[in-house]
Amino acid sequence: MKGQRNIGMVAHDERKEDLLDWVQHNLQALIPHRIFATGTTGGLLRQRFGDLTITPMKSGPLGGDQQLGSMIAEGRLDMLFFLIDPMAPHPHDVDIKALLRLAVLYNIPAAYNRSTADFLITSPFMTGEYIPEIKDYTPYVKRLGAK
C-alpha cells in the first residue's frame, strides 16, 4: 500500500466530537485519502469537512460496521480509525467485535483511541510504502477438507 489510502472511520456517539476535533487537527494529512465512514459519523464529517473525500456507509447498528468489515476482508480498506466509547453499552456489540476482529485478522492498522490515531496519522508509513504481513490461513481453511 502506498500513497492514497482507504480509511474507515467510526465513532460512538460520545466520541463523535473527539473524532471531529481529531480530523480538524489532521485535516491536511487526511485530504489525500478516501474516507469510508458509518452513518452519523459520515454525515458529520461531510458537513464539516467538504475538502475530504467521504463515502457514507449505513449506520453502525444498521450494518455499517459490517460494510466496513466486508471491505477489510476484500482488501479494500487500508486502515481503521474507530473511536470507541468504553463506558456505554452498544446494542450491536457483536458487529463491533466482528469489525475489530477482521482488522486484527487482516492485519490492517487500527486505532481505537485518539493517542493511537495520532501515532498512525504521523507515521511515515501513512504516505510511504508499506506492505502488511498477512498470515496464511490456508491450513485453517483446509482443516476439514474445504477447498
UniProtKB/Swiss-Prot annotation:
It comes from the Bacteria. CDD domains: MGS. Its EC number is 4.2.3.3. Residues 1-147 form the MGS-like domain. SUPFAM superfamilies: Methylglyoxal synthase-like. Belongs to the methylglyoxal synthase family. This is Methylglyoxal synthase. It comes from Oleidesulfovibrio alaskensis (strain ATCC BAA-1058 / DSM 17464 / G20).
